[in-house]
Amino acid sequence: YPIMPIYLKTIGFSILLIGILEGVAEATAGLSKGYSGKLSDITGKRVPFVQLGYAFSAISKPMMAIFIYPLWIFFARTIDRFGKGIRTGARDALLSDEATAETKGKVFGFHRSLDTLGAVIGPTLALIYLYYFPKDYKTLFYIAFIPGVLAVLSSFLLKDKRVNDIQPKVKMPFFSFLKYWKESPSAYKKLVIGLLAFTLFNSSDVFLLLKAKQSGLDDTLVIGVYIFYNLIYAIFAFPIGIISDKVGLKTIFIIGLIFFSIVYFGMSVNTNLYLFFVLFFLYGLYA
């Protein structure tokens, strides 16, 4: 992930074009999450969505390096986010099935901790590779296909829980998942409205990395600060998840938003190398 904005800049993408790319990609992920999540509920299946989602994301990695045409890059990045959208709802449902009201934070915190540990190991290996082969970003995308395939293969160890009720076959238009809004409880609606407002002011982590690079950090330090952020994320996700079960999910969520605000304000005015690490430390706690 930290390689991508640097790679896009080297092949001629402007910051505006990178922003449009990320917007299209995240919109694809968001819409596919809603549709795939509902389809997973209707079919009673979780694992096939997880497998298909990881497969799409794996395929997208070498696609980023095959051609450098903007439309092709848009297509490859969208495939990656489409895969994320397909698997996310089903994966979270699998986690929810294993959690109780008292262990929600613990279960999801443990998942995020291990998931983010991979985001530490991957960029670290990429950093080592770039030390010996500077600027060879394309090869890294080809190499990234290997762990992607391993993720798909490991997903075959998962098993769906037996569903007693036979699910009827129904036609499901793509935007039909939006109908849930009408029947959802008021507490859910308030949460979604709050998240929507937050998302409108949020931006991709790509821009934080580009800001760091724009402020004078070289490619190695940009990747290094991203590794540091993910390391903090991985270390604290599980214990903070446990704490959230004790003090309340809402309290931890609000504290996270405060950290987010501090980080983005700091990023807008900071040019100091060491302060970037402080800000990414707080960003890791927020995440």
What are these regions (language model features)?
Residues 160-194:
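Juxtamembrane intracellular "pre-TM" segments in multi-pass secondary transporters
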Residues 1-29, 187-225:
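Helix-loop boundary and gating motifs at the non-cytosolic
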Residues 76-117:
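Cytoplasmic helix-loop-helix junction between adjacent transmembrane helices
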Residues 6, 10, 121-141:
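Transmembrane alpha-helix termini and helix-breaking/packing motifs in multi-pass membrane transporters
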Residues 138-156:
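Symmetry-related core transmembrane helices of the 12-TM Major Facilitator Superfamily/SLC fold
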Residues 249-287:
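C-terminal transmembrane helical hairpin of 12-TM major facilitator-type secondary transporters
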Residues 48-62, 145, 251-266:
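Structural signature of the two symmetry-related core transmembrane helices
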Residues 32-44, 130, 237-248:
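Helix-to-loop junctions at the C-terminal end of transmembrane segments
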